[in-house]
Amino acid sequence: MNRIAQTFQRLKERGEKALVAYVTAGDPDLDKTREILVGLKEGGVDILEIGVPFSDPTADGPVIQAAAQRALKTGTTLSRILDMIQDLRKIIDLPVVLFGYYNPIYAYGTERFAERAKAAGVDGLLVVDLPLEEAEELRGKTDSKGLDFITLIAPTTSEERMCRIARRAQGFIYYISITGVTGTATPSRDNVEREIRRIRTHSDLPLVVGFGISTPEQARELASLADGIVIGSAFVRLIAENADSPELAARVSSFAREIKKAMQE
């Protein structure tokens, strides 16, 4: 059982839900990203989702797009991110999921990437612009290294396609709670509840809800429907607002603690 499965099992036994936190690697720089990730762990985050910056992040809203541009300007690369994760593994045992686009992985080399990601301590991969039908080559490489290939299901996903995605899912299923890009709308509880029931008929894997969750109240409400939630834009916005502050990691940690507390109420 890998770190992702162990985490969901442990949380289930405790009657808790997973807080998955997304940050863009290299924003404001990789040294501070490392400090932020440590702060997230101290704040009670259960799974770290580390974004690989890309120049054309079509699934991301303006907050994360801006973070990607800042990270690229500081020279952040996939190779340097993997180095950071490997260094982070000396002090953090939380599951790490890489979130990004296919282009940087393709440019790096899929086999080389899978080997390096495994060696660095990555547990899962979510490639937002790689549909199921086009993922087999990369997935073959990641499967051979024991990395979970995490898949997305959206409100617009048909029943037939949902069934196919669910059958091939690993680690957990990521349900996109809104149509559009990250951080730009608020999910409807009724819609999310209905879609989660639909997904659960096709898979027993843990299910997390992401996109549009930014407050403790939203976290509490949506966590009650799923096995966990993902918060991204709210963390990235907080990082941007405090990038030059010596209290950056502490403020991110405090916000994580506030979210996690709300999820337990």
Curated annotation (Swiss-Prot):
| TM spans (from-to) | none
Active-site residues annotated for this sequence = 49, 60
One Gene Ontology cellular component: cytosol
- InterPro entries for this protein: Aldolase_TIM (IPR013785), RibuloseP-bd_barrel (IPR011060), Trp_synthase_suA (IPR002028)
Q: Which reaction does it catalyse?
A: (1S,2R)-1-C-(indol-3-yl)glycerol 3-phosphate + L-serine = D-glyceraldehyde 3-phosphate + L-tryptophan + H2O
Which keywords are on file for this protein?
Answer: Amino-acid biosynthesis, Aromatic amino acid biosynthesis, Lyase, Tryptophan biosynthesis
Report the protein's function. Answer: The alpha subunit is responsible for the aldol cleavage of indoleglycerol phosphate to indole and glyceraldehyde 3-phosphate.
Which protein are we looking at?
Answer: Tryptophan synthase alpha chain
* Gene name tied to this protein: trpA
